Amino acid sequence: MACGQRGGSWRPSGWFNAGWSTYRSISLFFALVTSVNSIDVFQLVNPAFPGTVICDERGITVEFPSSPGTKKWHASVVDPLGLNVPNCTYILNPEKFTLRVTYENCTRRVHGGYQMTIRVMNDSAALRHGAVMYQFFCPAMQVEETQGLSASTICKKDFMSFSLPRVFSGLADDNKVTKLKMGWSIEVGDGARVKTLTLPEAMKEGFSLLIDNHRMIFHVPFNATGVTHYVQGNSHLYMVSLKLTFISPGQKVIFSSQAICAPDPVNCNATHMTLTIPEFPGKLKSVSFENQNIDVSQLHDNGIDLEATNGTKLHFSKTLLKTKLSEKCLLHQFYLASLRLTFLLQSETVSMVIYPECVCESPVSIVTGELCTQDGFMDFEVYSYQTQPALDLDTLRVGNSSCQPVFKAQSQGLVRFHIPLNGCGTRYKFEDDKVIYENEIHALWTDLPPSKISRDSEFRMTVKCSYSRNDMLLNINVESLTPPVASVKLGPFTLILQSYPDNSYQQPYGENEYPLVRFLRQPIYMEVRVINRDDPNIKLVLDDCWATSTMDPDSFPQWNIVVDGCAYELDNYQTTFHPVGSSVTHPDHYQRFDMKAFAFVSEAHVLSSLVYFHCSALICNRLSPDSPLCSVTCPVSSRHRRATEATEAEKMTVSLPGPILLLSDDSSFRGVGSSDLKASGSSGENSRSETGEEVGSRDVMDTKGHRTAGDVGSKAVAAVAALAGVVATLGFICYLYKKRTVSNH
């Protein structure tokens, strides 16, 4: 038996909008167990609600406990003061012991969700007591309601992700007892294929869960457990059903979601962009882009053609697409900023978001081995009629150079080029057993005036030729050529030595930030690099790096950091070299390493805390190393070290822009700001109290290069500690005196 009850005209502010988003991909329900706040207006008998509250997108269901003694009871929706809520419609089912209400008119909108209060009257003889009021909270069920987050599946290259609203607190609770009762579990798949995993097990399977203040982001890799893969030709679609359960004391949260993703690139021709989706159980409902939501029945009228045989194909007219400049495209690249596809899947609405763009390469590419001549040139011809509209041959340019064609016949619409492989901006690269040379030709269309030269109005043509390794041996006598002198001798090369905050080497310290402050054993990240050169054939090789107590790199004492391109073997904390990745244009132009901050010690005396760093380096020919240091292998033997010694004319020396202030681990400056530390360091005051090798001290080199004992001893430690104690005592006495003086007045 079910009865409906309706009130008068009370309607609180800020109510939930009943028009749920048609692009929902996440369905959630939230079960609160035995932890609902209760307020007994007349008699506080049962402070915790013994039943279950289920929150879903349509409303709230309250399930009361059923027992043989519960025969007569009544429940109603009231406001926080216990008064009946007018205009509230709810369904009370005494047989199933349930109360069902809608969010509209029966709840109060609060931050993050909805609040509802009910009053329960139990008139049974066994459980006779007065009315008890219970207050419930239901979270906002859709991500769109909170912080403007997207509820659709976001397709990436190797995984799909979707956002869930963060509808509870306590994930980071430090209470150990609470943590033992909390935990995640994940159900993957549906039907008989459901697999339940704990969160650590799911992480091992490749899943990941990211949580911030407003949302939870769940990542599902395409090869994870439970992901269904649909394939049709070269098109792929991935689908997964998930149920995430979070259990905490008195509370159970369940998120249910179906996610789909079609990550394949689109195909483009002269007029359309085509998106292909394999056949799967879902049925397309609508397409959304550029703030337009187009129903499937209206696609053709909006420039989109649909093929629904053997999967789904959507043909977008290029008039609907945006354009952007691209290095790989002739003029522009066509794309959509985002495209949302909404499907009806197993009676649920599921959406995915993709970012389609037309893939394009250089439109004209001449690739043939015959273009490369045996004497090291590339020969090719360009005709004006190669394109429509025709090319203006007078505007032809070769790369970024001023090289001109060797022959031009305007009547025939022909120009002929004879380009040296080592000039005119020609580039080369190695692939397997071939060396490939490449250049690019620029030209304007004949219907554009010469003043309109710009990247988006240019025609570009790539010309390539290659030599095989055997061809190089047969046709070119490489051994007879002397190596380029400028690659190892003094020339227009400039080096720079810089320090970085960490091993990401993103942004170096500026000159105005010196002196830098470091504590003992704290790493100092260094980088030596070549500047103002883009020659890919040169390679920077470190010779030596050392530290001094003055800015003069030739001053003594010195301490070695790098010797003959290798870490100093006698160092307690050896230098670590870092590889240079492909994020920079010429990785061979860089050398990166770090060393641990140390105390400067000489003859049992602590030297100045300001330390200056210097490096010497060589520039080598990468293709033909002409110095033993250019191909050094660490560690270096003493015999090889003598053989690899470079002349002073070959080496270049660089220094850091400023010194580094070194402090001991227990220095009283640890809590002081960086600017105060720099001021202290630049004044020459030494605040270290530990200089033994076990805390980061290092021996220095005398003028003959011999090691000097590096133990400061207990006297230096005691002196510094005593001085610090005296200063602290005097400061405390002054403080007491001032305080007493103020109180007397």
Swiss-Prot record:
Region Disordered, annotated ranges: 469-491, 673-709
Alphabetized InterPro entries for the sequence: Zona_Pellucida_Domain_gp (IPR051148), ZP-C (IPR055355), ZP-C_dom (IPR042235), ZP-N (IPR055356), ZP_chr (IPR048290), ZP_dom (IPR001507), ZP_dom_CS (IPR017977)
Tissue distribution of the protein: Expressed in oocytes (at protein level).
Gene name linked to the record: ZP2
Subcellular location: Cell membrane
Quaternary organization: Can form homopolymers that assemble into long fibers (in vitro). Polymers of ZP2 and ZP3 organized into long filaments cross-linked by ZP1 homodimers. Interacts with ZP3.
Keywords: Cell membrane, Cleavage on pair of basic residues, Disulfide bond, Extracellular matrix, Fertilization, Glycoprotein, Membrane, Receptor, Secreted, Signal, Transmembrane, Transmembrane helix
Name of protein: Zona pellucida sperm-binding protein 2
Single GO cellular component term: multivesicular body
Glycosylation sites: N105, N122, N310, T462
Primary location group: membrane
Function according to Swiss-Prot or TrEMBL: Component of the zona pellucida, an extracellular matrix surrounding oocytes which mediates sperm binding, induction of the acrosome reaction and prevents post-fertilization polyspermy. The zona pellucida is composed of 3 to 4 glycoproteins, ZP1, ZP2, ZP3, and ZP4. ZP2 may act as a secondary sperm receptor.
